[in-house]
Structures are given as C-alpha cells and as structure tokens.
Amino acid sequence: MIPESYIESWRTHVSWQTLAMVEQDMVISRALINLYNHPKIQDSLIFRGGTALNKLIIVPPSRYSEDIDFVQRRSEPIGETIDAIRNVLDPWLGDPKRKLTERSAKLVYQYAAINNLPSKLKVEINTTEHFQVLPPFKVLYSMDSDWFKGSCTIMTHELEELLATKLRALYQRRKGRDLFDLWFVFSRKLADIDNVIKIFHKYCKNDGIAITKDIFHSNMVQKRLNKDFQVDMNVLL
C-alpha cells in the first residue's frame, strides 16, 4: 500500500524485523491522526494498551504493536462513534469487517502490504468499562513522512493508569507482551510502582474482584509454564 522507499525511510523511527511491520506502524500512525482529528473520537474515546504505551510514552518504541485499542469515556451508544471511525478510515483502508459483542466493538481493515502480503489493522473499543481513576491525559502526536504528514491531540490515560490496566491484562490473559511492557517501564524507573498497584486495586474493586499478592503470584507461576505466554514476544522485538 505504501511505496517501499517511504517504508525504508520510516525505519529511522522503528527498527522492526520486516518492512511489513514498519509499514503497519505507519498505517497505525496515520490512523491515529485521522481518528483524533475527528471531534467525536476526540470527545468519546481513550487510547490505551500496548500500542498507546509505545506510540505516546516510550520513545523510541520498545516493541512492535499491531492493533489500536480504545475504551469509551462514558456510557453511550457506540453507533455514532463507529460512523466517525469509518468516516476517516474507510476512504483509504476500505470497508472493514465488523463485530459487535456485549463488551466490545471491533473493526478489522484488511489491506495489501508491501510485496502484496495480506495485512490488517484492528480497531477495538471496550464499550462496557466507563471507568477512570485519573483524569484523561492529552498528548500531542505527529507523523512526518513522504507518505503522510499530520498531527493531532490524543486522549489517553496517565502513564501509571496505563500500567495499572496492563497489570490487570497480565493477570487476565496469557500474553508475554504485558509482562515485557511492565518490565520495560519499571526497569527504567519511568513510573511509581506503588501508585500503579493502588490504581490496579481500584480497577479490581470496580470489576468486583479481589486479587491478593499470593493469588497474583500463583497466576504468574502458571503462566510461566504456558507455551503461548513464553513465545508471545518472539516476533514483537
């Protein structure tokens, strides 16, 4: 989709394993700028997850990210937000596959990457968790390449709240990337771990669950033996 020379030039920003991964990074960057220049997205969605960490906080990014994850700021019908997303992404990514569940809305855009390799961009919105501990945080974001130039203001969480939701994800699923993201930030002393844990417990309370240190430790011992957890990071560095 993007000329190879433009992708090669973008390697100065990200040094991923393949040109297709570099191209995906460019697609994500442009998509974010398109999205957050739409007033409905700016008002309704908070950008979070590993891609948010590596696009907005960790510079240069510590690992490859492939999806865009949002959460709604408030409880409201998702239809108008989906229309806004499609309004800015469909013109250059085509019609997406859509999946609506009780907890989320997903749009999957498929495109031909470099060398005609099939690729996709998944945009997922958590439509049930209308909860934040700290006020939303605004970050200026820009892209400057021969393929696309633009800027926007992205609504996200404060770093310690992003990490608290990462800590919850580490407990809930079997993806080594969650552990890697937490290790990367804490090993560089970029955040206060005690504050992260306090926010984590507030999310647990909102979810109606109690996770003690022993329960979390047992969960991690089991994950260490899981093959999917062990190999999750293989292609992301």
Residue map of PLM features:
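Structured mid-to-C-terminal alpha-helical surface segments
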Residues: 1-45, 56-63, 68, 72-237
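Glycine-rich beta-strand-to-loop/alpha-helix junction loops that act as flexible
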Residues: 47-52
